[in-house]
């Protein structure tokens, strides 16, 4: 696979070999970064970040990744500061921005927006989240985090907890985990179950999938608990949100029933689904997970720019 010029829109576009290339490249770049402090692979290259939706970690880690590679960054953090506010179409925005840059990272509230941007642009486009659809770079850093912690992904029992209906991070992660020999535990309120088509695809690919609303009944089985917040902004009906708000909280009492080796992950931001008392335990790796976004996004940028 020739990576130069490639778009990163959905984890579905990746083979297992593709995923392993990204993870291995990230591992190499992390080592180089620790040794040298600053790399120069992307010197003279410009990243454009187009964030039509709020972001802290994804936007800043992409910017940090590009700077660590020796490149430059332009862009906007909210649509109100762009000509979209004047009525400019997404297609015209993309065609304009690509004149100034070598790669585009886009986050947009509408599903399919990143795919549209990739169809319009002649430079690589990386999806930083499109509505409740996909978040492929988060998935890659999640896989990197799991592999880094356990030395493997195969053979693990992984629980996905919370908003499995609207959560784009868990949609992408579940699909990627189908490439590995894992057992998946899908833990959510009935109203927020994983979409049926994803569950059916997982089972067709041979993944063992358990579904439950009772966290305590499975917590002792898990190697990884991937927690997500229940996303108020994704609900079409506020009453539906109020029915499931605060469904779960991971705290010391919950973790007392877990394996000593359990690792707790979260794509962040959190609200109240993980109590702050968990932060200082050996289980919590969500801030390590945040850091891992830098080498993984460095790897993706370097690969699609053709500089590594």
UniProtKB/Swiss-Prot annotation:
It holds the Pfam family OTCace. InterPro entries: Asp/Orn_carbamoyltranf_P-bd, Asp/Orn_carbamoylTrfase, Asp/Orn_carbamoylTrfase_sf, Asp_carbamoyltransf, Asp_carbamoyltransf_Asp/Orn-bd. It is an enzyme of class 2 (transferase). The keyword Transferase applies. GO terms for molecular function: amino acid binding; aspartate carbamoyltransferase activity. Keywords: Pyrimidine biosynthesis, Transferase. Its EC number is 2.1.3.2. It catalyses: carbamoyl phosphate + L-aspartate = N-carbamoyl-L-aspartate + phosphate + H(+). HAMAP family: Asp_carb_tr. Heterooligomer of catalytic and regulatory chains. NCBIfam families: asp_carb_tr, PRK00856.1. Belongs to the aspartate/ornithine carbamoyltransferase superfamily. ATCase family. This is Aspartate carbamoyltransferase catalytic subunit. It comes from Pyrococcus furiosus (strain ATCC 43587 / DSM 3638 / JCM 8422 / Vc1). The gene is pyrB.
